[in-house]
């Protein structure tokens, strides 16, 4: 049985043989390092804005070229004098350039979407890593983003993080300049930026040793954890973070690392079409108020379609100046004609509205003036009623031979008819004029209409058709 001294000796040996607790690898990121990483991430997110701006500009210019080609033709053929060959070829060049650009639109949009997707995805990886480090903070002795003048880092210290402690969202804005991915990428390892904090602060997120990191406690080996899609690889030895732990270190450019696909896609926005792009830029200058004084343009043989043109053609500087003058004059007149046309349309619309109002008023008058043929006779009000229910003021009672009493109208009341409406003759019994007539007699009478098996008054139908025809005519 071992003695107490032997036990003490064994315990001491075990302690001495255990590796010393590493400290340097728990030194957190500095504010400057986090800021440089966020600067790169923000530039990646700007790719979406740049792509959207370029696509919009490309499509707008392509549409302008189509309008320009049409206006060129109108200006040189509808004006005075015969156009020069150079002016005609300038119009053809505008149309061809538009067609060439339209053929590339699908490629442009696809490339813009690819660049936006790749770069935004990688920005998300980076910002998620920074956000985890930002949240891993308990007190002045435990933080993973260290600020030298005060331990309590704030959202304002980390450009990726908003005031609420969350991550900033991507917003699409107008951006004409290409994002500077490479310079932001290399800035991460510039100077002392990539180095860990001077004090320990106990950040185990940057410790890859399984005995020192609770997240790796079940591992049997040390692991070089990678953060931000490989942007940062944590040390596993007793060393602090330095430039060697960051991916941009010893890289010539962003094209050599994990972000090369994003950078390559960005280079294709917009697609490189030097000929069409240069021609478009040149021709669109002719829309300026003042003569742009363009230099001559050479149209090479067979450069348009097939074997056209059959020889080289020059559009001289004089041709461009003449075309600019004719285009300006045509558009000025065209604008004036457009104003006159708009004025005429407004006047026509005003008259139409007046006609509509008149037709509606006329229709209302016709509708209110229609006679009602709803007949109320004394027999309808009294026939079949018992003696006690017969109105005494307008009717009398008579006893039949069989002893039954009936309600009968007074003398002269049988043919009374209530009519409504305005106008002379509204109270006439129009329905009575047609009622009972046979079909041959009914069809000959202008005020009657044979309908089914009955002869009816047609005045109501005529009035309605007249009103509808007036309203329809007013709105045509």
Swiss-Prot record:
Chain segments carrying region Disordered: 367-439
Disulfide pairings: 38-160, 144-203
Glycosylation sites: 356
Propeptide: 458-476
SUPFAM superfamilies: Variant surface glycoprotein (N-terminal domain)
UniProt keyword Disulfide bond, yes or no: yes
Polar residues bias spans: 369-380
Keyword field contains Metal-binding: no
Residues with a covalently attached lipid (GPI-anchor amidated aspartate): 457
GO cellular component: plasma membrane; side of membrane
Gene Ontology biological process terms from the UniProt entry: symbiont-mediated evasion of host immune response
Signal sequence annotation: 1-22
One Pfam family, short name: Trypan_glycop_C
Protein's membrane topology: Lipid-anchor; GPI-anchor
InterPro entries cross-referenced by the UniProt entry: Trypano_VSG_A_N_dom (IPR001812), Variant_surf_glycoprt_trypan_C (IPR019609)
Basic and acidic residues composition bias: residue spans: 393-416, 426-439
Keyword annotations of the record: Cell membrane, Disulfide bond, Glycoprotein, GPI-anchor, Lipoprotein, Membrane, Signal, Trypanosomiasis
Cellular compartment(s): Cell membrane
Purpose of the protein: VSG forms a coat on the surface of the parasite. The trypanosome evades the immune response of the host by expressing a series of antigenically distinct VSGs from an estimated 1000 VSG genes.
Listed name of the protein: Variant surface glycoprotein 4
